[in-house]
């Protein structure tokens, strides 16, 4: 075997390790080029050819561009790609959370239900949402997010509007089931869609703004609801009925526009679901997009954006046990936030606040969340630290939960409100976890399935949260708060344990790799059937 070949493979190993262990800056792809070696570039070219990768014609290992050109391009992508994804996600959250505002207007009483019936409806929604996550994501991978996502938005908007006609418990549960079915898969669809355009570090940071839509539109939703609900009595309709109708039609307009505004991919930005037109980017910009993405993660070209994921590949991803610590945190990390967020209006009503105040008083907590969410992501990015930054959320929540448990039931309602607001305003690190899963997946297949499985784990947490406060525990939910305290302590320990787990996995791989001779290392790189994060030359970021 030639010296050149040996040098190439050893360099490849080093480059893969470096790329896996560090969070790159937005412009690092300019200086870091894993395709500098001709043999490695040709190996990857063959991978891209066999996969039918749509960006192959733009792949150029020798292509160069300036930092200013890349920064300008990223800003343009933010405006033309990310902004609309943000808007679509905002309306997902507006529609799926408007039920929490509807209950402040006697929704439960009007349908002759109780808290447990409401819990059941929320649980059904979340279970169906969870079950639809992976199928929805696989449909998007097969037919394209620019087609599937707009259809989802239109369907959930129609269902939202029909909720204005609800009369009883059975109809309520049926519409929650339908809503969960059409909304499932939307979030991992969009994460995968954004991964076509952004590097790993860029994606994680932008996902923090992606999830800023939650507090931002909860604030807007609360303001909107406080006004709409005052329409109760007009044409003999309840305020919550007007809420579903108005917000449903607003969402419907976004769904229709999405058919025209979502694009097929970086080299196909002239193609939407309904037409082919002028590309959003120049040929030169498309070439930068393709090469910067592949240099950040060469595996992003190992599947085309229409290539389906097989059942065998799904099972393979399920055996990627190194993703499981992140899935576990996806389940438990935000149960406190999800519980308090779902029940805040009911809790405030039970504390004798008016319907109007119950909606308005939700705003400070959401505003605090809106501030803390990007700050947590920025801290993670600056420190190049994921595990411990994820743990910050529950360190923040701990004193508020302890106080809720310790204070007597006759404590001033305003003090309880402040504690609940503190929980709602936690540094929401969901974006760090979601981006982390995408970043360490190390293949399009694992990324497609892994992001869906992570979001499914988050829905399991939401199911737990929707049943945390029970009818026999109100109005103070003392038992529920004690359970939340237990979850909070577990989450802090889990964040630290995850870091040590990945450190130990990297040390194990180092020992295995360093025990090989150079010839054995070269042979491994040429012949191994290990994929993704199971490869010995792959290192975990933590």
Swiss-Prot record:
The chain crosses the membrane at residues 79-99, 120-140, 148-168, 177-197, 209-229, 242-262, 327-347, 360-380, 388-408, 417-437, 483-503. The keyword Transmembrane applies. Coiled coil: none annotated. SUPFAM superfamilies: MFS general substrate transporter. One of its GO terms (cellular component) is cell periphery. PROSITE patterns: MFS. Signal peptide: none annotated. GO terms for molecular function: organic acid transmembrane transporter activity; organic anion transmembrane transporter activity; sulfate transmembrane transporter activity; sulfur compound transmembrane transporter activity; transmembrane transporter activity. It comes from the Eukaryota. Its main location: membrane. It holds the Pfam family MFS_1. Residues 100-119, 169-176, 230-241, 348-359, 409-416, 504-542 are cytoplasmic. It is found in: Membrane. GO terms for biological process: organic acid transport; organic anion transport; sulfate transmembrane transport; sulfite transmembrane transport; sulfur compound transport. InterPro entries: MFS (IPR011701), MFS_dom (IPR020846), MFS_trans_sf (IPR036259). Residues 1-78, 141-147, 198-208, 263-326, 381-387, 438-482 are extracellular. It is a multi-pass membrane protein. Belongs to the major facilitator superfamily. Allantoate permease family. This is Uncharacterized transporter YIL166C. It comes from Saccharomyces cerevisiae (strain ATCC 204508 / S288c) (Baker's yeast).
């Amino acid at each position: 075997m030639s010296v050149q070949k040996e040098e190439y493979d050893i360099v490849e190993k080093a480059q893969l390790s470096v790329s896996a262990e560090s969070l790159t800056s937005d412009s690092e792809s300019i200086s870091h080029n894993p395709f500098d070696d001709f043999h490695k570039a040709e190996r990857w070219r063959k991978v891209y050819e066999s996969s039918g990768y749509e960006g192959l014609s733009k792949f150029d290992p020798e292509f160069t561009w300036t930092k200013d050109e890349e920064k300008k391009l990223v800003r343009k992508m933010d405006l033309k790609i990310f902004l609309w994804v943000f808007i679509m996600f905002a309306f997902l959250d507006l529609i799926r959370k408007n039920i929490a505002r509807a209950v402040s207007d006697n929704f439960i009483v009007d349908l002759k239900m109780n808290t447990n019936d409401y819990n059941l409806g929320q649980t059904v929604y979340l279970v169906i949402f969870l079950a639809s996550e992976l199928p929805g994501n696989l449909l998007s991978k097969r037919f394209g997010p620019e087609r599937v996502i707009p259809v989802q938005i239109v369907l959930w908007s129609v269902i939202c509007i029909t909720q204005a006609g609800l009369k009883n418990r059975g109809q309520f549960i049926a519409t929650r089931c339908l809503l969960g079915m059409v909304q499932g898969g939307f979030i991992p669809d969009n994460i995968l869609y954004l991964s076509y355009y952004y590097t790993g570090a860029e994606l994680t940071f932008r996902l923090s703004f992606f999830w800023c839509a939650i507090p931002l539109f909860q604030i807007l939703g609360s303001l909107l609801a406080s006004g709409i609900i005052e329409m109760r009595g007009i044409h003999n309709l309840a305020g919550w009925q007007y809420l579903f109708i108005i917000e449903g039609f607003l969402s419907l307009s976004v769904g229709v526009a999405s058919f025209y505004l979502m694009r097929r991919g970086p080299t196909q930005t002239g193609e939407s679901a309904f037409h082919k037109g002028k590309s959003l980017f120049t040929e030169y910009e498309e070439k930068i997009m393709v090469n910067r993405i592949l240099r950040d993660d060469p595996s992003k070209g190992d599947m085309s954006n229409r290539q389906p994921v097989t059942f065998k590949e799904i099972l393979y991803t399920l055996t990627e046990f190194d993703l499981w610590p992140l899935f576990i945190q996806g389940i438990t990390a935000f149960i406190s936030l999800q519980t308090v967020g779902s029940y805040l209006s009911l809790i405030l009503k039970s504390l004798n606040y008016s319907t109007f105040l119950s909606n308005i008083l939700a705003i400070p907590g959401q505003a605090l969340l809106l501030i803390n969410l990007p700050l947590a992501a920025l801290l993670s990015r600056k420190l190049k630290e994921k595990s411990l930054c994820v743990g910050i959320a529950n360190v923040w929540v701990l004193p508020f939960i302890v106080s809720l448990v310790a204070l007597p039931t006759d404590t001033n309602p305003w003090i309880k409100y402040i504690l609940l607001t503190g929980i709602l305003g936690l540094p929401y690190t969901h974006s760090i976890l979601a981006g982390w899963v995408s970043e360490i997946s190390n293949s399009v297949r694992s990324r497609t399935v892994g992001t869906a499985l992570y979001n499914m784990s988050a829905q399991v947490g939401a199911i737990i949260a929707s049943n945390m406060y029970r009818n026999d525990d109100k109005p103070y939910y003392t038992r529920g708060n004690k359970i939340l305290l237990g979850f909070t302590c577990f989450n802090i320990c889990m964040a630290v344990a995850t870091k040590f787990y990945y450190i130990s996995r990297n040390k194990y791989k180092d020992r295995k790799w360093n025990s090989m001779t150079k010839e054995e290392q070269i042979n491994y790189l040429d012949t191994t059937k290990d994929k993704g994060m199971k490869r010995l030359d792959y290192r975990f970021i933590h």
